[in-house]
């Protein structure tokens, strides 16, 4: 932890280590690592990494009906005019998950203490468990702030949902 940091706040936090392994058993993890390792060789030979955009290059009028959650939620933001941008088509390089699968991002979460941490999450966020798990692992001082009637993406741009007053007070109190 960079000791210059005085306080940490997250909104709609995602633990990519956990997300990269969700639903996988040990054999599937190993097979995925094998596939991604081979792709790294291909990327090296090509001189650039493979990147497969997750969202369309032009905004859609509506979310495709066959999408399930949380994919439909991502599309409600990134694939529609609401959050679409030509330079933000989602996803990572094909091999990005290999790095996430090889270490746990929250292993040293306790080292943030004694600096305070504020976890902000929507009560309907599919990602809520990431913040709850991180909150449980974190040392004091810490706070889990739940925004009513909000899903993950609402904390990106819905100004009536983003708790600006809470964030302002948190940082004013901790940037002394």
PLM feature segments, named:
Residues 144-146:
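Conserved beta-strand scaffold positions in the cores of enzyme catalytic domains, especially
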Residues 124-142:
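Conserved loop-alpha-helix segment in the C-terminal half of the alpha/beta-hydrolase fold
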Residues 148-176:
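Catalytic active-site module of serine/aspartate enzymes centered on a nucleophile-bearing elbow/loop
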Residues 110-113, 137-139:
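Short, conserved loop/helix-junction motifs that constitute active-site signature segments
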Residues 17, 91-109, 126:
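Active-site nucleophile elbow and catalytic-triad environment of alpha/beta-hydrolase enzymes
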Residues 122-125, 149-151:
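Acidic beta-to-alpha connecting loop that harbors the catalytic carboxylate
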Residues 112-113, 118-121:
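Short beta-strand/loop motif that positions the catalytic acidic residue
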Residues 1-77:
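Alpha/beta-hydrolase-fold enzymes
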């Amino acid at each position: 932890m960079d000791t210059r940091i005085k306080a940490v706040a997250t909104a709609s936090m995602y633990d990519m280590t956990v997300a990269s392994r969700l639903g996988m058993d040990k054999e599937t993890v190993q097979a995925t690592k094998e596939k991604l390792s081979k792709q790294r060789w291909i990327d090296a030979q090509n001189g650039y990494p493979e990147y497969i955009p997750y969202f369309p290059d032009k905004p859609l009028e509506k979310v495709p009906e066959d999408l399930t959650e949380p994919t439909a939620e991502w599309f409600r933001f990134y694939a529609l005019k609401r959050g679409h941008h030509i330079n933000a088509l989602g996803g990572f390089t094909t091999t990005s998950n290999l790095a996430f699968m090889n270490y746990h991002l929250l292993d040293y979460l306790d080292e943030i203490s004694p600096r305070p941490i504020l976890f902000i999450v929507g009560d309907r966020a599919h990602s809520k468990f990431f913040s709850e798990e991180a909150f449980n692992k974190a040392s004091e001082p810490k706070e889990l702030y739940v925004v009513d009637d909000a899903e993950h993406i609402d904390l990106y741009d819905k100004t009536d949902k983003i708790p600006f007053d809470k964030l302002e007070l948190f940082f004013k109190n901790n940037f002394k």
